[in-house]
Amino acid sequence: MRRPLAFLLALALLLPQGTTAAASAMPEAPNCPIYPSNDVWHSSIQNLPVHPSSATWIANMGGASRLLHPDFGGPYGYQLQITTNATPTTRVQFDYADESDDVPYPFTAGTPIEPASDAHAFMLNKDTCLLYELFAASWNGGRPTAGSGAVFDLKRHDLRPAGWTSADAAGLPIWPGVLRYDEVASGFVDHAIRFTAQRTDRSYVWPARHQAGAARDASLPPMGARFRLRNDFNVAGYSAQTRVVLTAMQRYGLILADNGSNFFFQGQVDSRWSDQLISELKRIPAGAFEAVDASSLMIDPNSGLARGANGVPLEAGWHSRWLSQSDYLVMSPGQVADFWIKFTNTGTETWNRGIWGRQANLGLNGDDKAPYRLGMAAEWLWDDRIATTTVPLVGPGEIAEFRFKVRAPMTRGTFRLNLRPVIDGTVWMEDQGVFWLIVVP
C-alpha cells in the first residue's frame, strides 16, 4: 500500500507540531478564537441527561409541531464589522448604563446596524480579539446611543457580572451563537447556536447572567437553557450543508438567549446561503428537540470554562488517554483477525473524521513501516496509519473506538505493533507505550 497523492500534497501543508486552530475562528480574524475550545459554547451536550421539564418547556414554546425558523438568508441576518486598533472609537450613551460597559466602542457611521427593531450592532477588533455588541444602536448624527452595550474578550472565559444584561436578554454574547456561512461550508460547526422563545421564566441558568421573563413560572424555560436535536433524528435525507447544521444541533445544541419568536435562530448575512438549506431547516419540528441538564459542565458559576463530557478533566489542545483494547492473539501465518482499541479524548478539541488536521488516526509510533513490509496491513488507511475513529465526531471527554484488521506475517515469531493516536497535519498525541503482540508459533 502506498500513500495517495492527495496525502503527499497535504503533507507539504502540515502545521508545525503542536499548532491548533482557533476555535470557530473566522477567515477575517484568523487569530481570534470565538472563545477557547474548552468554553461552554463549544461543549458537547449530546450525552447529557434530558431535563425533567423538557416536554413542558417545549409545550410552552409553541408545542411539538412548531417549526424551526432560520432567521437569516439573502439580505437578512446579523453583520459583523471587523475593526483594528486604528479604527476610530467613540463613547456611547446607554439607556441601561448601570449594566453596560462604559468604554470607547469602535462604532462608526459605517457600522452595520440590524434593520429590525432590536437594532443590534457587532464589532470585532481583530488586533485585540475584543467583541463589542450593542442593542438598540443608533449613530444619531455622531452622538451615538444604545439601549445597552457589552464587551467580551474572546480569548477568555469571562462572563458578565451576575444580573447584568448585554446586547441580549440573557447577558450572553450574541456573535458566538450566530451561524456563519464559512463554518457551514467547511463542514464543521463547533458551537451552540443562539435562539429565542416568546415567553421565558424570570430566572436564568449558567452561563446566562440575566433574565427578562414574562412571569415567575417554572413551566417556562429560563434564559441559558440548552436544547439539542435528539440523537435519533435521522439527518441522512438532508443536503450536505443542512446536515452540518443539524449535526451541530445534536452535539452542541441551542442556547436560549433572548425573548422573541419561538425557535427562531440567527445567522450571518451572506448571499451564499442556499434556498435549499433555509427551506430544509424550516421543516424541522420543535418536537425533534429536547432540553438537557447542562449543570454538570459548570466548574465556576462566574466562568464559561467547562468540563468535558463525562466529567473528564481536559487539557488545552489535542490529547488522548488509553482506555482499553482487545486481547493479544496467537495467529496462523497469513491469518487475518479483527482488533479494537479505545482512547478517551482528554483535550479540548473535537476529533472530526474526514477533515484534515482534525481527524484522529491510529498510527504506528514513529511512522514505523516494518509491519507493513511484513505484510501485516489489512485494509489499513496507509502503510503506517492503521485506522480512524468509528464515529464521525469525538468531543472532549468522549470515548473513541478504532477498529481494524491485522494479517499475521508468514514467518514465525512474536511481532509488536507500537500504537499512538495522531492528528495528521497537526500533532502526535501522547506516547503511552501502547502496543499489540501478534504471536505466530
Spans of features found by a protein language model:
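Short, surface-exposed polybasic-aromatic patches that bind anionic ligands, especially phosphate groups
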Residues: 24-313
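Short, surface-exposed loop/turn segments at beta-strand-coil junctions that are enriched for proline
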Residues: 405-413
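Low-complexity, acidic Ser/Thr/Pro/Gly-rich terminal tails and inter-domain linkers that flank the onset
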Residues: 310-332
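Enriched for extracellular/lumenal, surface-exposed ectodomains of secreted and cell-surface proteins
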Residues: 390, 420-427
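Short, solvent-exposed loop/turn segments enriched in Ser/Thr/Gly
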Residues: 333-340, 413-417
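Short proline/glycine- and polar residue-rich coil/turn motifs
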Residues: 390-399, 439-440
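Bacterial N-terminal signal peptides
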Residues: 7-17
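Short acidic, flexible loop segments centered on an aromatic residue
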Residues: 346-382, 420-423
